[in-house]
């Protein structure tokens, strides 16, 4: 299990020092969000060309689950529904290499989760989801990519608020120091 986690970058094995949860430096974190933004934009573009009516229905179901989680003020349920929504788009893209690269971005999950908990982020995500789902549904790859890129970049924009939160709560150790 640790080898699988290490393969996707979620843990680092340091010989006799043992295995530790991976932490990203600030430049690595910013670079990672930039790459994820482009990968998800590509997934949205390809999904807009390949999606079926049943898959569109699945996207809207996940979106409704996000709305319910927001209404219930349940960020955990929101994160699950959000992951299912994004995962469905990735699957619909049908691009095995893109799917493989996206698995490598699992290292960002804890950071994305903390950003999602920031005030106003869930509500904004719901509106952003509707925009890229409509674009995918209509087959407009350019609009789908633009909307998705904006959605993921909004997470990176929320990074400064997240960093302030970490500093104020004393949780800044989840960010790696330069080595």
Spans of features found by a protein language model:
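Short amphipathic alpha-helical segments at helix-loop
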Residues: 17, 24, 47, 70, ...
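C-terminal regulatory/effector modules of DNA-binding transcriptional regulators
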Residues: 121-179
């Amino acid at each position: 299990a640790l080898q699988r986690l290490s393969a996707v970058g979620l843990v680092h094995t340091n010989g006799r020092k043992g295995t530790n949860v991976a932490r990203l430096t600030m430049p690595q974190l910013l670079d990672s969000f930039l790459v994820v933004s482009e990968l998800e934009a590509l997934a949205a573009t390809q999904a807009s060309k390949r999606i079926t009516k049943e898959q569109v229905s699945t996207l809207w179901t996940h979106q409704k689950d996000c709305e319910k989680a927001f209404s219930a003020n349940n960020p955990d349920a929101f994160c699950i529904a959000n992951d299912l929504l994004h995962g469905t788009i990735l699957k619909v893209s049908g691009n095995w290499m893109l799917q493989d690269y996206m698995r490598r971005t699992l290292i960002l999950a804890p950071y994305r989760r903390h950003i999602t908990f920031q005030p106003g982020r869930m509500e904004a995500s719901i509106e952003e989801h509707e925009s890229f789902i409509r674009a995918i549904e209509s087959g407009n790859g350019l609009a789908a990519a633009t909307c998705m890129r904006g959605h993921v970049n909004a997470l990176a924009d929320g990074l400064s608020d997240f960093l302030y939160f970490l500093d104020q709560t004393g949780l800044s150790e989840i960010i790696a120091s330069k080595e």
